[in-house]
Curated annotation (Swiss-Prot):
GO terms for cellular component: host cell cytoplasm; host cell nucleus; viral envelope. Pfam families: Herpes_env (PF01673). Zn(2+) 2 binds at C408, C411, H484, C491. Zn(2+) 1 binds at C107, C110, H187, C193. It is found in: Host cytoplasm; Host nucleus. The keyword Zinc applies. Keywords: Host cytoplasm, Host nucleus, Metal-binding, Zinc, Zinc-finger. This is Packaging protein UL32. Residues 408-491 are annotated as: Zinc finger 2. Plays a role in efficient localization of neo-synthesized capsids to nuclear replication compartments, thereby controlling cleavage and packaging of virus genomic DNA.
Amino acid sequence: MDRVESEEPMDGFESPVFSENTSSNSGWCSDAFSDSYIAYNPALLLKNDLLFSELLFASHLINVPRAIENNVTYEASSAVGVDNEMTSSTTEFIEEIGDVLALDRACLVCRTLDLYKRKFGLTPEWVADYAMLCMKSLASPPCAVVTFSAAFEFVYLMDRYYLCRYNVTLVGSFARRTLSLLDIQRHFFLHVCFRTDGGLPGIRPPPGKEMANKVRYSNYSFFVQAVVRAALLSISTSRLDETETRKSFYFNQDGLTGGPQPLAAALANWKDCARMVDCSSSEHRTSGMITCAERALKEDIEFEDILIDKLKKSSYVEAAWGYADLALLLLSGVATWNVDERTNCAIETRVGCVKSYWQANRIENSRDVPKQFSKFTSEDACPEVAFGPILLTTLKNAKCRGRTNTECMLCCLLTIGHYWIALRQFKRDILAYSANNTSLFDCIEPVINAWSLDNPIKLKFPFNDEGRFITIVKAAGSEAVYKHLFCDLLCALSELQTNPKILFAHPTTADKEVLELYKAQLAAQNRFEGRVCAGLWTLAYAFKAYQIFPRKPTANAAFIRDGGLMLRRHAISLVSLEHTLSKYV
């Protein structure tokens, strides 16, 4: 076995990103690397309990003591000689972790890959496996379950090829904050460092225009990262005394909290940013060409029967429902409004796991931690369990409105083949429930009740999931179902982004040679295209920013008008953008 001594610090990192393996810090089962790798495989989550607990812990905010005094601002309370009362706050942690989303901050996932490449080399087998992870990431909806799985499998892939030979592991890197879940989200789902289409699926730039396309895509990337960063930073204000103000927030001319200044400036130009990477704009669309959304809808209709036939023939094991259980574990009490025994059990399990990991590993994880995060490993620090695993969520915001949350439980179900079809049938049943003019919202509860009576649920393929699907739907609540299926733009794009052919119709370990050839072809082709153009994503993130940071009615009206025009060009129909903007989040 080759042995490598780690350097401190490593190139591009303030602290070592990987650590030397010991019997206590890798945690992999003996058979973890024995089978061929398939990306987004819920069975892999059972191969390392230590890593699972680490990622769950790393998805929570950290509280540290801070001084406050009633009727004194944050800046004044820091002055010498002021007798301050101590309280706990997540503000400092949020501000440190939020720096990951700065435009001029290097991608630490890319830096990690470059470090491994220079120190150990990248084998063709690793490249093929990583290509499958990237391809399925582009075909998945942005949600907490997908982000958790991407982080877990990134560590899995690196350890699969480098743990045994070089005695190094990435297990522990998230707990030590040398990597963060925001790094994973940025690399795989926000900037998407491996994407090759410049944000315009199926459209090749004219010769000589490649540089301009990269600049346009960078502007899009800055915009969506600014929205997520602003949403994250706004969490800290909810824990402060009302008399305190944060330097990064201000009151704009509308008289309403506008969010951090970079976001306010970005929102003012969202339409120009979107137009440059919108496949429906006159600059990119030629006569007879369908938009990305129209193409995705057409492909989904064609593939549904193919997937049903596939599910009829396949024998599913218990691990197939792993992502449903993961969704309940991560989002119970966070994105749910109705409580039952399963959701209560999930909350207790999650909180217990986070606290146990912190108590057992705090001292170990304080070694080699980056300097700016050292204070968050002290005895006085502790995980903030009230917000749940918020760093895994798409928008990282704690707002609730109209019995909805910024993170959607139903989006998480799109990663499961059975549930992808079940949600489509569920929507059809709601639409067909009444032959009269009964509102769509009023049709939801009766359909939920009808599906609850069927055990197992009667579909065109075996669907005995032991009640998981209907449990999650009930826990989310009728408002969240209405928002997901008919109202919310981010949910609509998550459905369009989900590519069932890539997620569910690839070769399996039943024919390993075909599987390995498939992965090798993905790597050789190096064609990683999204399913939804970056212009639509710009609109979706702008919509979320308007929900989280309300504007004046005149600004809202202009935004709804411009956004509605773009949706019509893409043939996307949603119920009342005005209602969704003001009543949901």
